[in-house]
Swiss-Prot record:
This is Large ribosomal subunit protein uL10. Belongs to the universal ribosomal protein uL10 family. SUPFAM superfamilies: Ribosomal protein L10-like. One of its GO terms (biological process) is translation. Forms part of the ribosomal stalk, playing a central role in the interaction of the ribosome with GTP-bound translation factors. Gene3D superfamilies: 3.30.70.1730, 6.10.250.290. Keywords: Ribonucleoprotein, Ribosomal protein, RNA-binding, rRNA-binding. One of its GO terms (molecular function) is structural constituent of ribosome. Part of the ribosomal stalk of the 50S ribosomal subunit. The N-terminus interacts with L11 and the large rRNA to form the base of the stalk. The C-terminus forms an elongated spine to which L12 dimers bind in a sequential fashion forming a multimeric L10(L12)X complex. GO terms for cellular component: large ribosomal subunit. It comes from Bartonella henselae (strain ATCC 49882 / DSM 28221 / CCUG 30454 / Houston 1) (Rochalimaea henselae).
Length: 172
């Protein structure tokens, strides 16, 4: 990479950090190419991304962002997992770490808040924004459905009574 490419990469990475709801830093030393590809595909399916960058360039890209506090995590072979949804990157990273001992989560950030390894694991156990939205819509729509059922119940009862009288009249 020449200077111009590095500058462009740092600008791109800085923008990615700014747009991210959460950033996770992990060691990946010893993972095979197929394991890395598996991690990348799982992360992209969930709506996040994985980036391997030189530590020096990542530290420069973090300057001026809310995630600047995690600069100290960048040592050794590190990768960056990030997503706009604050829950996606931690959830995928923690799930992947459960099955791959060589993938070690170092920490991360959510906005201006630095996250320890335990905080990342706790964050991963929360439902995603889409799951929360679905639950909220369900909670809002359930009372409306019940009100509609209560309002329609008397009309349904009247129809059944009239139907019963009609059946009686035919039988007689």
């Amino acid at each position: 990479m020449n200077r111009a490419e590095k500058r462009e990469f740092v600008t791109w990475l800085n923008e990615a950090f700014r747009k991210s709801g959460s950033v996770i830093v992990a060691h990946y030393s010893g993972l095979t190419v197929s394991q890395m590809n598996d991690l990348r595909s799982k992360m992209s399916e969930a709506g996040g991304a994985i980036k391997v960058a030189k530590n020096r360039l990542a530290k420069i890209a973090l300057q001026g962002t809310e995630s600047e506090s995690i600069v100290d995590l960048f040592s050794g072979q590190t990768l960056i997992a990030y997503s706009e949804d604050p829950i996606t990157a931690p959830k995928v990273a923690v799930d992947f770490a459960k099955t791959n001992d060589k993938f070690v989560i170092l920490g991360g950030s959510m906005g201006a808040t630095s996250l320890s390894v335990d905080a990342v694991k706790s964050l991963a156990s929360l439902p995603s924004l889409n799951e929360l939205r679905a639950k909220l819509v369900g909670m809002i729509s359930t009372p409306a459905t019940r009100i509609a059922q209560v309002v329609n119940a008397p009309a349904g009862q009247v129809v059944r009574v009239i139907g019963a009288y009609a059946q009686e009249g035919k039988a007689a």
